[in-house]
Amino acid sequence: MSQQQGKFIVIEGLEGAGKSSAIALVNDIIKQHIGQAPVCTREPGGTPLAEKMRDLVKIADETDPLCDEAECLLIYAARTQLIANVIKPALSVGQWVLGDRHNLSSLAYQGGGRGLMPLVKAVSDACLRGFKPDLTLYLDIDPTLGLSRAASRGELDRIEQQAIDFFERARRTYLQLAHEDDSIVVIDASQSMEQVHNDIGIQLQRHLSTLMSEQ
């Protein structure tokens, strides 16, 4: 009998949307349903080499500022490494994978926010070759509120320091892509954490039965 393929679930959202607590919740729900914890990843990053690329993207270097196109390519290099060495191997042996960001982030941030959508789509097509999550939960929040939450956690990284209009463009792109793809579920992250987690639980339970029946 052939090995059942695992499932790939991703949590997306702007800064301050509450991804970390949502990931912990989804991790617990998946564990309850399949009897084991999923493999957890983050992007950019998730492998030793990809983590080095993450540092290049996240940490500002005033002596050699990272241009937008290089930022995009570094993120896809890290993503391709993660898919090849972690995500696909796990899925192939029946493990589920829970991702903190994936390709939707690049479409929203580099495509929408940076205005590089043609480049993003071309690189995405070349690197991913149609690979995508089975389910994405997008935590939607107004950028002003999200950045206020992020700032309260401490020093902002290079991406978090972008102008508000960058995040507004990214948010519009997220919502447009969610409108076009039934595998992307929008969660109102401006609510209380309790209500957000309740909504996540409802949506995840609804989709888990379908995903498990497809194994």
Swiss-Prot record:
Top-level enzyme category: transferase
The gene coding this protein: tmk
Family classification: Belongs to the thymidylate kinase family.
UniProt keyword list: ATP-binding, Kinase, Nucleotide biosynthesis, Nucleotide-binding, Transferase
Pfam families: Thymidylate_kin
Biological process terms in GO annotation: dTDP biosynthetic process; dTTP biosynthetic process; dUDP biosynthetic process
Annotated catalysed reactions: dTMP + ATP = dTDP + ADP
The enzyme's E.C. designation: 2.7.4.9
Organism whose genome encodes this protein: Shewanella frigidimarina (strain NCIMB 400)
Protein name: Thymidylate kinase
Gene Ontology, cellular component aspect: cytosol
GO terms for MF: ATP binding; dTMP kinase activity
Binding residue positions for ATP: G13, L14, E15, G16, A17, G18, K19, S20
HAMAP family: Thymidylate_kinase
General function of this protein: Phosphorylation of dTMP to form dTDP in both de novo and salvage pathways of dTTP synthesis.
UniProt key word Kinase: yes
